[in-house]
């Protein structure tokens, strides 16, 4: 907030903010009377897989289950965001909704097995109601101009 004072005092016509949507909102809130515009569209929190390709990693759901699922997020990695195990529709380890993706729950099972924590699969977690979304998303610049 204190760092915004020189900007506000300069009375610019507008502010173009190079940040995620939260940053744009923060600047707008602290720059009264100054229009604030995003320079980019925030898609999601993800990780770079290789140049020009990112994969979604977190939904900021506020009810993190990573400690129970071996560090693999079922809300983000499962297309149906199932938190208590697989849907049963996977084929050859691939997701039935998006066959390009590995089944999140097979990945979770393998990870928990690897770290000696398969007992965590027996815990029931409350459904988060994220079924209306389709995750994980991937953004690729390949073929874009």
What do the predicted segments below correspond to?
Residues 2-15, 28-68, 72-145:
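Iron-sulfur (Fe-S) cluster-binding modules
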Residues 23-26:
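Short, well-ordered alpha-helical microsegments
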Residues 17-21:
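N-terminal glycine-rich "phosphate-gripper" loop used for MgATP/nucleotide binding
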